[in-house]
Every structure is written in C-alpha cells, then in structure tokens.
C-alpha cells in the first residue's frame, strides 16, 4: 500500500525479496519478514500484531532458561501468562503436561524464547491444533539453517519462527520472522509497518542478506565445528573437575556448555573472568541446580580453532576457579591462542569484488 509508505521505498523491495528467497531455501519459509532490529524486537512486533489483550499464553520461565523479558513484555499488552511445565532432567518441556494445559485451559499462544539450552527444545511435540506457537529460535537459528536441528516450520501448522540473527547465526544484529501460515503473515505484514516501525535500517538488511548467502555456502561446516567445540571443551572441563551438565551423556547439541557449581565458585569464576577479559555468563536458576556458569563456543568456532587451542582454553578456565589467580599466567595463555581470523566466510577476493561492484 503506497499510501502508507515513503516515495522511493519500492527500491527496497528487491532486497526484501532476495532475503525471502534465501530463507525459503535454507529454512523452508514461505513468508519472511526481516524488518525487526533484534530478536527481542521480533517478540515485540509479533505480540503487538498477533496477540490480543486477555488472551492466554504459555511461556518458558526464566528459571528454566527462558528469556527474562518475555513475561513483562507480553503482560504489558494485557496477555495472561503461565509457565510451561518443564522436565529438568530432560532439559526440555514436559510435553504431555503442556498439551494437557493447552487443551483444557484453551491456551491461545505458547511463546518459547530459550536463552539457556544445551539441547534444542523438541517443539514439534506441541499440539498446535487450537493454539499458535511463537518459537524464538535465536539460540539455534544457525543449527536449524544448517540442518543440525529440527525445523518445525517444515512440519507444523500455526507457527511463527523468529529470532535474532547474531547468535548461532553469524549475521548482523537484526531480527527475522518466518512463517508458512498465510493468515499469520497477513496479520503482521500490514501492521508492523506503518504502525509500530517506520525505518527498518536497510544497511542492516543488506548485511543480513550478505550473511544469509554466506551461511548457505559455509554454515554447515561452521555449525558442526561449533558443536564439536562445545563437547570437546565440556569433556575437558569435566576431566579437570568441573561439574559439566549433559543430557543422556551428550554435553551439548548446541553452542552452550553448562557448569554447575556453588554460588561462591560461580562468583570467583565470574570475577576472575572479568579481570582477565574472558567472556562468560553466571547463572542463578533451577536449570543449573542453583548456580552455574554458561559458556558459548560460537565465536571460537568461527575462528576455526583446533583442539590444541581448546586445550589452552581449558587451562584458562581452570585458572578462573582459583581464588588466588595469577592473572599474568592467564594472560600469557590468552596471548598464546591462535589469531582471531574469521573462517567459514567468503574469501577476501570475493569481498573485494563485492566492494568493487558497490563502488562502481
């Protein structure tokens, strides 16, 4: 509808179409919307356009790894929330209990936005006959695109799959909404713009398009190495005395590693990490049996670091649990790591040719 758009906006449409074409190939998505800026912005846009005040929604609680912002955001819109039943031992929802609640209490939506997970949620077990699944796949988007994680878009109805494009998917900070249900697409398509978003920052979308095409070529190898890094590093840390979580013997099917520990050890590791400029997260939630540390391997995997480098990272992480840490020793270990050179990406030659096209 040109009445609701700016003069010249039609020049942008081919780029949106190209993004849609790539997402059709790697995600199997019929309808794609890259206008949101982040994964959290996707949640904001989707719930504002699809959900109605007074409706009922199941969410993944913060204690079970859910994104802490979901509950206040949707409740601010007048949506009534309740926590989805969860099985701590399985690191997944209790799907029998979830489906029972959906059917008995006439749940309208189930919004799952996991921040912490060492195995992808088995969302295909959710009965969406009479409800809509809003699946924030930010943490596993790259794994889905690489075919290393189930893709519910291909098997389920009444689902919107979305997420941030800068976690396991190695793109710019952006958001991506996908669905194969036309009625859901129609609810969002003409409401997001012009009501809730005016400027979609096209430089960001061009970067996303470039990253999608790059991932189509190199993403499978990258994701496989990322999962290898998580399991190799986790096994090393377990051998060195850390309590590393697993699910049925597998330390991770994602990029994350869970270390369970006391509050005192958690604080020691975190404080030392801050001093040594090591990036990790501390956690206080039931998913970690109280307290713990979360590690992510998506960045080191992009450098294509080998097992020898992972052995060095193990030594660094072991030092972090020492109250009397020798910071100079840790910094020497960090300095001994390989260069931070991006792999699983277009070559410099390809990028140079792209830049030449742009300049001309």
Tell me the role of every PLM-derived stretch.
Residues 11-14, 18, 22-33, 37-243, ...:
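Conserved PLP-enzyme active-site core in the AAT-like
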Residues 1-2, 185-189, 207-214, 248-255, ...:
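Short acidic (Asp/Glu) and glycine-rich catalytic loops that position anionic groups and cofactors
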Residues 1-6, 82:
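N-terminal "arm"/small-domain region of PLP-dependent enzymes with the aminotransferase-like
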Residues 178, 258-262, 296-298:
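Short hydrophobic/aromatic beta-strand micro-patches
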Residues 212, 223, 227-270, 274-292:
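Conserved small-domain helix->loop->beta segment predominantly found in fold-type I
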Residues 289-360:
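PLP-dependent enzyme catalytic core of the Aspartate aminotransferase-like
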Residues 5-9, 300-303:
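Glycine-rich tight-turn/loop motif centered on a GG-T
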Residues 196, 276-280, 321:
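A common structural junction motif
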